[in-house]
């Protein structure tokens, strides 16, 4: 019974991930050049947009030594400290072990962790769903 449930969760998760891969691949052809991707981004370039760019920065360079403060307003600017360290540290370790870059290491790691989270949530909530 439990194994069948995990397979069902895996099936739904795989469909959702396949949809997002197809969607990112399609929209990459329409993505305007930005500093994170440059012109003509591929799938892996698209995975480091949005929050992925912050995780990449942390994995490659670490956290900044101090919070960046806007000189005019005195407010804290956007920075890497808004993101938890577990994912970028795991990515950094895999980058070191494999010699591969963050987009190639981070994307499969996020998929694996997402699957583990989907199974855990499914097992925790299956009596309520």
For the regions a language model picked out, list residue spans one by one:
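Transmembrane-helix motifs of polytopic, lipid-linked glycan transferases
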Residues: 92-96, 105-128
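Juxtamembrane/transmembrane-helix boundary motifs at the membrane-water interface
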Residues: 24-43, 66-76, 97, 102
């Amino acid at each position: 019974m439990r194994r069948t449930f995990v397979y069902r969760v895996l099936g739904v998760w795989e469909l959702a991930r396949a949809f997002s891969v197809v969607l990112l691949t399609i929209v990459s052809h329409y993505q305007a050049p930005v500093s994170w991707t440059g012109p003509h981004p591929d799938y892996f370039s698209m995975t480091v947009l949005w929050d992925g760019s912050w995780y990449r920065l942390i994995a490659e360079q670490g956290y900044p030594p101090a919070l960046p403060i806007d000189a005019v307003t005195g407010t804290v600017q956007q920075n890497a400290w808004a993101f938890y360290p577990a994912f970028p540290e795991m990515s950094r370790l895999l980058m070191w072990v494999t010699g591969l870059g963050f987009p190639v290491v981070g994307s499969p790691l996020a998929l694996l962790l997402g699957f583990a989270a989907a199974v855990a949530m499914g097992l925790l909530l299956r009596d309520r769903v």
